[in-house]
Regions:
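CE4/NodB-like, metal-dependent polysaccharide N-deacetylase domain
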Residues: 20-47, 140-158
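Active-site and substrate-binding clefts of carbohydrate-active enzymes
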Residues: 84-119, 123-331
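Aromatic-lined carbohydrate-binding surfaces of glycoside hydrolases
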Residues: 1-6, 53
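Secondary-structure capping and boundary motifs in well-ordered enzyme cores
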Residues: 26, 48, 52, 256-257, ...
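A generic short-segment signal for beta-strand/edge and adjacent turn/coil regions
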Residues: 13-15, 36, 80, 126, ...
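Catalytic domains of cell-wall/extracellular-matrix polysaccharide-remodeling enzymes
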Residues: 30-84, 150, 163-183
């Protein structure tokens, strides 16, 4: 937290018990679920809200991931700390090259916030053909700027997979059809995936310093650093301490141990903390607040413990009117 939010208020507890091991558990479990559905191992991963740190990338290396991605804020903070060439920084030329942090292997791709937010927030109000033409025009401008080295570069567009389309007419079917028609036949713009781009020789650039943060404002502020969010963390830490104490006794059956472990994983989900705060709509905050506290109470019950009275007290009220009902953040 301190690397991303050095001046923000902190929870009472200074860290999450065995956080690194819990992160490994979630990745391992995620890989098992992925393999169950697709009978394959993914080559890359998008961590929650593109949250990155040096430790997180090191963990991805342990699991053999070839790529991950984040937002332009993390890229900019990292480039500034790494003293990347000022022209490449301010012109965003360095944004269009995958980076490799220190001695780590995992390639890092960073989102073009401008292009991505056009799709996420602006084009919904445009005529589909005009929007598609504008996007392709922007891509052509980038290609012209990159010049002869264009083949070594990748323009990264990332947005929430489902949240944008409900704000378009007909779930964006007209816009997407027009866009893919233009891109698929364009002589200079090639659609690709991160894995294919790496296989085809996208040039990796060294990044000495990786600043921690996410694609939301380039920090971890969507999860921590405000009173409501910090209190939610303290409740989770106390539940984890209880979990560890009960597990150390070895008294739970194998079935109860599994149930409690899976319930803990639900409580550790990042989206709970996303919703807490006065900037989100009250109805949504109220629902997520109540559900979060209920899930924590269920964890205590599975452990054979009485839920603490603190779980009866609401954490957050909301009251804001975030764009797109708070499901996406504009950068």
């Amino acid at each position: 937290m301190r690397d991303a939010l050095p001046d923000a208020p902190t929870p009472v507890y200074s860290g999450y018990p065995d956080g690194y091991e819990r992160a490994k558990w979630h990745i391992k479990h995620g890989l098992e679920v992925f393999n169950e559905h697709f009978a394959a191992k993914p080559r890359g991963v998008w961590l929650s809200e593109g949250a990155l740190s040096s430790a997180a990338v090191g963990l991805l290396d342990e699991f053999g991931f070839k790529w991950t991605a984040s937002g332009e804020g993390v890229w900019r903070h990292s480039c500034e700390a790494s003293h990347i060439d000022q022209h490449d920084l301010h012109s965003k030329k360095a944004l269009y090259q995958p980076l490799q942090h220190s001695s780590q292997n995992c390639a890092l791709f960073f989102r073009d916030d401008g292009l991505s937010d056009l799709i996420g927030f602006q084009y919904k109000d445009w005529h589909p053909q005009d929007a598609a033409n504008n996007f392709v025009h922007n891509m052509e401008n980038i290609a012209n700027f990159l010049g002869d080295a264009v083949d070594e570069h990748v323009v990264t567009v990332i947005l929430d997979g489902e949240n944008a389309w409900e704000y378009y007419p007909d779930n964006a079917s007209h816009f997407l059809t027009a866009l893919y028609d233009k891109l698929s036949s364009h002589p200079r713009v090639e659609m690709t995936t991160f894995s294919d781009a790496l296989d085809k020789g996208a040039k990796l650039r060294h990044l000495p310093v990786l600043k921690a943060g996410s694609w939301v404002y380039g920090s971890f502020s969507t999860w921590i650093g405000e009173a409501d969010k910090n209190k939610a963390w303290d409740l989770l830490v106390e539940a984890k301490q209880c979990f560890d104490k009960v597990m150390a006794t070895g008294e739970l059956s194998a079935e109860k141990t599994l149930q409690a472990t899976l319930q803990l994983a639900i409580c550790e989900g990042s989206d709970w903390f996303w919703w807490f705060g006065d900037y989100n709509p009250s109805d949504s905050v109220r629902d997520f607040d109540r559900l979060y506290r209920r899930h924590l109470a269920k964890l205590y019950e599975l452990l054979g413990e009485v839920p603490p009275p603190s779980l009866d007290i609401p954490l957050s009220q909301g009251g804001g009117q975030m764009e797109n009902a708070g499901t996406m953040r504009r950068n």
